[in-house]
Amino acid sequence: MTEPILQIRDLSVYYNQKKTLKDVSLDLYPNEITALIGPSGSGKSTLLRSINRMNDLNPEVTITGSIVYNGHNIYSPRTDTVDLRKEIGMVFQQPNPFPMSIYENVVYGLHLKGIRDKSILDHAVESSLKGASIWNEVKDRLHDSAVGLSGGQQQRVCIARVLATSPRIILLDEPTSALDPISAGKIEETLLLLKKDYTLAIVTRSMQQASRLSDRTGFFLEGDLLECGPTKAMFMNPKRKETEDYISGKFG
């Protein structure tokens, strides 16, 4: 059996001493898409932000448990969070390109690493934009502002910006919820292509999207991971009544 690339064990997250994520254990596997589903406020995004330590930015957050990546607990004091976020990239719900050119957006992370060689940067821009399935749309206007692109194009540039740092895991927090159906479809096609080379975890409110994209699904309710397993099995024969009710739209 394939070994997980990342192991979450007994992870709890407290906001102002209120336990919002409760003893969650979950594995992410190489070259798979894991969907995180559940009602608003169930802990999905909190878990995602814990995986690359984005929750560190909130001083009111306390975390217990462990997340093991590359054989080390990422919450160890010796973890370099800058390096961690290069290997575990994040794409947010709202497209958030920087107010600079498409080219500069993509190489932003490489500049932070001190890379200035134009040939390396040019290659990274082309390969990353191709990986995000947007190269053909922007290759003749790389020095135009990324803010002038459509919402779907902006989101794919944000994906390219993540790819440029050579991550192993990509986290996506409702990446299509702010987009029209055609743009959302292009993002989904891109994610299925990326699965060949990366591990992905996606928070989604769309059961159809989870069913189309993911290999595994985790269902969250009030901070608990109630059920997790292969997506087809969960959608066809959920083990928990709460899972069945949520998937069938009885609440949410």
UniProtKB/Swiss-Prot annotation:
Keywords: ATP-binding, Cell membrane, Membrane, Nucleotide-binding, Phosphate transport, Translocase, Transport
Record flagged with keyword Mitochondrion: no
Gene Ontology BP, a term: phosphate ion transmembrane transport
GO CC terms, sorted: plasma membrane
Domain ABC transporter: 6-247
Record-listed E.C. numbers: 7.3.2.1
Primary localization class, coarse: membrane
Membrane topology category: Peripheral membrane protein
Record field: catalytic activity: phosphate(out) + ATP + H2O = ADP + 2 phosphate(in) + H(+)
Domain of life: Bacteria
Molecular function terms, GO-annotated: ATP binding; ATP hydrolysis activity; ATPase-coupled phosphate ion transmembrane transporter activity
Subcellular localization(s) per the UniProt record: Cell membrane
Keyword Transport appears in the UniProt entry: yes
Record-listed ATP binding positions: G38, P39, S40, G41, S42, G43, K44, S45
SMART domains: AAA
PANTHER family: ABC TRANSPORTER I FAMILY MEMBER 17 (PTHR43423:SF1)
Oligomeric form and interacting partners: The complex is composed of two ATP-binding proteins (PstB), two transmembrane proteins (PstC and PstA) and a solute-binding protein (PstS).
Function: Part of the ABC transporter complex PstSACB involved in phosphate import. Responsible for energy coupling to the transport system.
Similarity field: Belongs to the ABC transporter superfamily. Phosphate importer (TC 3.A.1.7) family.
Protein name stated in the entry: Phosphate import ATP-binding protein PstB 1
UniProt source species: Streptococcus pyogenes serotype M6 (strain ATCC BAA-946 / MGAS10394)
Upper classification of the organism: Bacteria, Bacillati, Bacillota, Bacilli, Lactobacillales
